[in-house]
Structures are given as structure tokens and as C-alpha cells.
Amino acid sequence: FDLGRGSAVKVARQLNAPHETKKIVYCVRLEGADPVKVFSSGPTQEVVSKGDGVAEITVHAVRPGEERRSPDGQSDAPAEADLAPNNLIQSDDPTVVAMARQAAGEVNDPWQVAVALEQLVNQRMTTEGISAVFATAAEVARSLTGDCTEHAVLLAALARAREIPARVAIGLVYYRGEFLYHMWTEVFIGDLWVPLDATLGRGGIGAAHLKITGSNLEGAAPQAAFLPVTEVIGQLEIEILDVE
């Protein structure tokens, strides 16, 4: 899922340590659509309308055990499909299963396992020789090459292989003065979906990821998961208002 720099969203304010941030407040402007309907809202990201095509988005960095609730009070408990293998996230593939056992093999704590899997993907994978084709988790486990999409689906598959519900998140991430379209992983720990990014391998993320949508990729062609993103490309402005 590499759209290139041509689709990047530039911002005026620089972030010196984006992935160490605890909270960031953004103002987003979207031409021709309502950002409240486009950007995901939940315990880690609150989206509030500020008028026609404008919204304020507050993103919180979270870790398991923190008390956070969705602004609308709705539950986001994992579905069966968040734990089951499918055509893109083959958590029952022998290579995926074997790889999942290589990290934190004797550990039972789900968060420790998830972080170890994130680090495993980060350390094993390379971006050399990647193609524009969306690879499945089974293919990535064998090639160990790919961009953010391949990192995300492999980590999701490894987590499910260790009985941790997992899905992918699609949105934007800050990088050197601009936001790039990006994919990462979310794992369900305790009663909270916690984001992980295997391209970073930091044991969680800060507040510099803006989530548009999430998907367990069940029965979906890759293009279907990306539709909400394609609708905003070239139409989005982002302003960083406050950083903690």
C-alpha cells in the first residue's frame, strides 16, 4: 500500500519525536466529505465536528490496562473473524504458525507476546525488492519482504496464531513534515484495541497515527479495505494544534 509521496499531506508544524508523543490534537479539513464520517472514532481517537468539512481529532497513545472508553459509549469487542484465519491473514498457515512460536514462546501474557511478535516482524522483514502487489500473510512469512501493508498483515496473522484477536488499521502516519498513507496492526488486549506498528517495532505507537478505518480483512479483496482512504486522497488538509 505504497501511494508514494505524491499523495502525502504536508503540515506546517514539525514533530521532533512523533512516536514518543502521548496526545496530539489535530484540525482536519476535507473537501467534499464529512471528516466525522471518514475518520474512525473510538477510545484512542476522538473526532468532533467543527463545521462544514472540518473536524478536530484528538489521538491518545495507549497501552493495555489504561481506562479508555469510546466517546459514543459503543463497545468494540472483537468478532470471531478477528481471531480466525482468512484468505489474506492465514494464521493457520504452517510457516506463519512456526514463525509465531519463535517469539516469546514460553510467555503467556498476551501483551508481551504481541510486542515480541511486533519486534520479530520488524527485525526479520526488509523493504528490498517489494512490489505493488498486496501480498498475503502466508506469502510474506516466506518472502519476508514488503512495505507497511505486508508488515501489518503478517503481524496480524502471527497474533491470531497465538490466540490474540488482531486486525489492520488504515490511515496516515507522520513522517518528516508530512503525513503518509499507511497501514498498521491493532491487537485486542484486555478490553482495548491497542495499536502496534511493525515498521517501527517500538512496542506500541504514539499519537502520530491518524486512523481512517480498520478491517479484519475477512472475505475482502485488498482494494475494498482501502476504499475509505482513496476517497480522501488529494482532498485532505491537516493542522497540528497541540502536542503532549
Residue ranges and their predicted role:
Residues 106-183, 187, 204-207, 220, ...:
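Active-site neighborhood of thiol-dependent amide/isopeptide-bond enzymes
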Residues 74-79, 119, 123, 161-164, ...:
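Active-site rim recognition segments
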Residues 2-10, 17, 21, 86-102, ...:
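A short, charged
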Residues 10-16, 150, 196-201:
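Intrinsically disordered, low-complexity boundary segments flanking structured domains
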Residues 1-71:
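Intrinsically disordered, low-complexity N-terminal segments that are enriched in acidic
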Residues 48-143:
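Acidic low-complexity segments
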Residues 88, 94, 145, 177, ...:
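Short capping/connector residues at structural and topological boundaries
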Residues 33, 62-66, 173, 192, ...:
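Short, glycine-/Ser/Thr-/acidic-enriched flexible segments
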